């Protein structure tokens, strides 16, 4: 079997497992992919990034912090089963907010089924990306209302939310 000379997450057997050791995909040419996008993809990216020419990053960060703080406050007020896993200090946190919940995977699947998109990290972390480019305060409040409903009704306990999906 030919082994890749360079390793990259595109060719990893489990690219989203975040393992420190590289394990190439078994028996596939994909194992040779290293993680560098093609020139054509970069040219499209260049065009897409033009929108950032007129965005003030300080204003964007300020709005992100305001939305994140509102999200944390709403969850802590309405969803006592969740525990903040992210740093409380906004300067240490960035635009992701994470909460611990014993049934985090199933709860995230229930949220996704309701149109609230976040992701899950083992063993029990529910992670949300908070960006003012796509979200506003009403979106944040509505997401927490949906989360609260899922927790109160234990909708996360439904069988369809228990089965773990595989990431390919």
Language model segments and positions:
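PLP-dependent enzyme catalytic core of the Aspartate aminotransferase-like
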Residues: 110-168
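Active-site C-terminal subdomain of aminotransferase-like
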Residues: 1-63, 69
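Short alpha-helical functional segments enriched in proximate histidine and acidic residues
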Residues: 51, 74, 78, 150
């Amino acid at each position: 079997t030919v082994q890749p000379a360079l390793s990259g997450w595109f060719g990893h057997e489990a690219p989203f497992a975040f393992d420190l050791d590289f394990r190439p995909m078994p028996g596939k040419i994909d194992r040779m992919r290293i993680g560098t996008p093609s020139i054509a993809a970069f040219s499209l990216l260049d065009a897409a990034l033009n929108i950032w020419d007129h965005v003030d990053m300080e204003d964007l960060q300020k709005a992100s912090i305001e939305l994140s703080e509102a999200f944390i406050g709403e969850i802590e007020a309405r969803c006592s089963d969740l525990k903040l896993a992210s740093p409380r200090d906004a300067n240490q946190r960035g635009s992701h907010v994470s909460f611990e919940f014993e049934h985090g995977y199933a709860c995230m699947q229930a949220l996704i089924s309701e149109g609230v998109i976040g992701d899950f990290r083992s063993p029990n972390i529910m992670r949300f990306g908070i960006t003012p480019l796509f979200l506003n305060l009403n979106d944040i409040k509505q997401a927490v209302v949906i989360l609260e409903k899922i927790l109160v009704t234990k909708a996360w306990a439904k069988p369809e939310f228990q089965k773990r999906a595989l990431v390919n």
